[in-house]
Every structure is written in C-alpha cells, then in structure tokens.
C-alpha cells in the first residue's frame, strides 16, 4: 500500500479567494461579504425614501399630500403605505399592478414596499457586518447580538404587524408625522400604552438611558490620571494599556448611595447590554401580539361600574373613552373606502372628552 504525503494546493486564481481577498482587504471603509447585502440595500432604502419624500404624492393611497413638491416639510413629508385594496402585494415594478410603469408604481405606493424590504435587509446586513468584523479581529459578537433589538422592532412594526392586518396600508408610513399618527392609531385601536410588553420596552429604553448616563458620569468622576491634553478627549492615548479610572472608588461611591453596587465590570456592562436589548425584544413581541389582535389588560369591572355609576370614573375608564374617540375619528378619516357611518350610541360619551 502506498501512502502519499503532501499538501493540497488550490488554484491561486480561484474566484472565491479573489473575491474574499478584495472584500476583506484592510481599507478605510470595510466592505466584507456582509457589504454585498448591506450597501446595495441601504443605498436603495435611503434613496427610495429621499425620492418619495421629495416627489411622490400620497393622494392615490391616502388622499394626502406627502412630498416636498406638494408643500410638505421635513416633519410632514413621508413615503406612504399602499392603499388597503392592494392588501399584501409586494408591488413589484414589473408586477400586475404597475406593469412596468414607474409613475403608476409610485402612485400605488410601490416605494413603501421597496423601502421597507430593502431597509429590513439593510439592517440585517449591518448586523452581519458586525459579526464579520468581530470575527476578523477576534472579538465576541455581542455588538451584533445587541443590534438584533432594533431589527426585531423594525421587522415587527413595519412587516409583521401589517401582515397580521388586512394589508400594508396599516403599517407606519416612513415619515415623522406619519409615525406619530401611527402611534395614535396603536393607542386608539390596541390600547398600546397599557400593554405589558410596551411597558417593558419603555422600562428597557429609559432604563438604558439612565444606566448610560450614570456609567459615563461615574467613569468621568473617578479618573485618577490626567494627561497634558486640553480636555478629556485629548488627554489619553486610545491605545493605552492601563486603565485611568478607579472601579474600586466607583464601587465605594454607589455602595454608599444605594447600598448596593456593581463589583464586577463584566456584570456591569452585560447589564447595560441586557436592559435595552431585552426591552426592545419585549416590545417587538408585543407588536407581534397586536398583529394577531391580541388584547392586553381589560379591566371590565371598572368599565361596567363606570357605565352604571355616573360618579365613578378612573384614569383607565377615561383612557378607554379617549381611545373610542380616536377610533371614531381615525376610522372614517383613514379608511374612507369603507364608508363607515357610526351611530350615535357608539360615539364617545361622558366627561372624559
């Protein structure tokens, strides 16, 4: 029996190796394999949004003006969702709705699906970029894991929620005032502020802001080695090996303030990661529930008592009446194609309004 010993050599001109060498080359802006997804999708999403807010009307989908060309400003311009009659169509430019006509495609709301889908894949590409770079420089992938929070929120709000409803029409349009209108819609039709998943999301985001402020201030407060620079940002070499702040001093300070303090830097920073990301994940789960029209808290006993006793009212019952007012106004304004006419008995009543 003959045993051949040797090293298998690949063809030096292998296409994969050539692409890998070019994509992962050290340059000012890293490209990488993830860049093949990130850069085109981000370019099309941002470009589609600028195009829509500049030129494209929402008259045919919402009966609204939504572009700079029509007189809107940065806060009121938007790329609006397609009409409710188009349901969940992808609205491809070459599809049966637009039939290759770019003007008709814009009028039907094709830019919204274009921006939403390219935006989602662009965000995923950015997360993959963080994975790829972390692996290249031998870091842990916690940055990419943390970025899954914003991705979960974007996908749940802009894609999963309208998929659970009758069409893309019920997703948020891409604009500042349009997002505010969507928030009011969520409150009126889903009582979103009383949803425990929303509460966890608020606690996560605001708690993270508090932790960030406390952490930054504490590190600044416990600096023990000043440099020659004019300010903090110029005083230290970013590649210095030794720390220049005191964890022991910080621990002593917060132990006196609260009675407890972080004694371990890993646990401290993991907690700062855990709080906002978990909050975002929880709020995304809540939106998925709303896509299925799941209800959260309904304090029916208070509603019944408020209906029977004119002198009994709580902040909850007042909010329920406000929600009814939002629904009564929004349903007729936002869905004129439904020809909704509300009888007097279902319109808002009582002293809450």
Curated annotation (Swiss-Prot):
Catalytic activity: 2 a plastoquinone + 4 hnu + 2 H2O = 2 a plastoquinol + O2
SUPFAM superfamilies noted in UniProt: Bacterial photosystem II reaction centre, L and M subunits (SSF81483)
Residues involved in chlorophyll a ChlzD2 binding: 118
Residues annotated with Phosphothreonine modification: 2
Cellular component, GO, one term: chloroplast thylakoid membrane
Matching InterPro entries: D1/D2, Photo_II_D1/D2_sf, Photo_RC_L/M, Photo_RC_L/M_CS, PSII_PsbD/D2
Biological process according to GO: photosynthetic electron transport in photosystem II
Keywords in alphabetical order: Acetylation, Chlorophyll, Chloroplast, Chromophore, Electron transport, Iron, Magnesium, Membrane, Metal-binding, Oxidoreductase, Phosphoprotein, Photosynthesis, Photosystem II, Plastid, Thylakoid, Transmembrane, Transmembrane helix, Transport
Binding site for a plastoquinone: 215, 262
Record-level Gene Ontology MF annotations: chlorophyll binding; electron transporter, transferring electrons within the cyclic electron transport pathway of photosynthesis activity; iron ion binding; oxygen evolving activity
Record's bilayer topology term: Multi-pass membrane protein
Cofactor binding, note field: The D1/D2 heterodimer binds P680, chlorophylls that are the primary electron donor of PSII, and subsequent electron acceptors. It shares a non-heme iron and each subunit binds pheophytin, quinone, additional chlorophylls, carotenoids and lipids. There is also a Cl(-1) ion associated with D1 and D2, which is required for oxygen evolution. The PSII complex binds additional chlorophylls, carotenoids and specific lipids.
Major subcellular site: plastid
Description of how the protein assembles with itself and partners: PSII is composed of 1 copy each of membrane proteins PsbA, PsbB, PsbC, PsbD, PsbE, PsbF, PsbH, PsbI, PsbJ, PsbK, PsbL, PsbM, PsbT, PsbX, PsbY, PsbZ, Psb30/Ycf12, at least 3 peripheral proteins of the oxygen-evolving complex and a large number of cofactors. It forms dimeric complexes.
Note in the entry: 2 of the reaction center chlorophylls (ChlD1 and ChlD2) are entirely coordinated by water.
Protein name listed in UniProt: Photosystem II D2 protein
